[in-house]
Curated annotation (Swiss-Prot):
Location within or outside the cell: Cell outer membrane
Stated name of the protein: Probable D-methionine-binding lipoprotein MetQ
PROSITE patterns assigned: PROKAR_LIPOPROTEIN
Source organism per UniProt: Pasteurella multocida (strain Pm70)
Keywords noted in UniProt: Amino-acid transport, Cell outer membrane, Lipoprotein, Membrane, Palmitate, Signal, Transport
Name of the gene this protein is made from: metQ
Length: 276
């Protein structure tokens, strides 16, 4: 009987001792989960511009936790159509004169979110090295879309090769040429085809993205080049209905960085100017 009592007492003491040793610290809280990455689909022109934008996409992921999917296009008419249809959240390929014309002609509801670069257009030739070598009746190929056509004509006027009815009109066409002292034959051609025309014309005015694809750079190969005061700064554009999307604004911040600028210099070899 005594042994039973002693055993019971020992058990009670052990239980109390164990209770005293119990860790009263609260359980560690679970580590907070990383917020889900935001997602953006951005349209760009294929080639060097796409490669530069890939760096912006990398920075957007690292700094702002945005997964950026780039969709590449080969024709200027495609990215705004895809944006309007909702296939893209934004695009980065056009300047304001081009966007304004698209809005006017196609009724797109677009908004500017930020600037990227000025990619100066330039005149290239396999037949002459200086504009002074141009013969009477020389043939020049220019882009055929409205804004880049006007841009090319303004560049020709700045060189004294033609005179336009209204130089302030960014959408001048061939019928607005009121003086043409060298009787230039102006051929309007789809932009992506212009580099291939160099064997058939005296010179061509080519956008930088198409020129670079053929190993041409404005700084090294251009007969004459658009300067930094051009109004044709490229843009990041959204639809009106998503222009306040914070992810798009953060993507612009990622684009407007020194790392992206240095990548652009590498691909365009001096043929690029910061737009911010």
């Amino acid at each position: 009987m005594k042994l039973t009592k002693l055993f019971g007492l020992a058990t009670l003491v052990s239980a109390v001792a164990l209770a005293g040793c119990k860790d009263d610290k609260p359980a560690a809280a679970a580590a907070p989960q990383e917020p889900a990455a935001r997602k953006l689909t951005v349209g760009v022109m294929t080639g060097a511009e796409a490669q530069v934008t890939e760096v912006a996409a990398k920075i957007a992921k690292e700094k702002y936790n945005i997964d950026v999917k780039l969709v590449e296009f080969t024709e200027y008419t495609q990215p705004n159509d895809a944006l309007t249809k909702g296939d893209l959240d934004a695009n980065a390929f056009q300047h304001k004169p081009y966007m304004d014309k698209e809005v006017e002609q196609r009724g797109y509801k677009l908004a500017i979110v930020g600037n990227t670069f000025v990619f100066p257009i330039a005149a290239y030739s396999k037949k002459i090295k200086n504009v002074s070598e141009l013969q009477d009746g020389a043939t020049v190929a220019v882009p055929n879309n409205p804004s880049n056509l006007g841009r090319a004509l303004l560049l020709l006027e700045k060189q004294g090769l033609i005179k336009l009815k209204d130089p302030s009109n960014l959408f001048s066409t061939s019928i607005d040429v009121i003086e043409n002292p060298k009787n230039l034959q102006i051929k309007e051609v789809e932009g992506s085809l212009l580099p291939r025309m160099l064997d058939d014309v005296d010179f061509a005015i080519i956008n930088n993205n198409y020129a670079v694809q053929q190993g041409l750079t404005a700084e090294k190969d251009g007969i004459f080049v658009e300067d930094k005061d051009s109004p044709y700064v490229n843009l990041v554009v959204s639809r009106e209905d998503n222009k306040d999307n914070e992810a798009i604004k953060d993507f612009v911040k990622a684009f407007q960085t020194e790392e992206v600028y240095q990548e652009a210099l590498k691909h365009f070899q001096g043929g690029v100017v910061k737009g911010w």
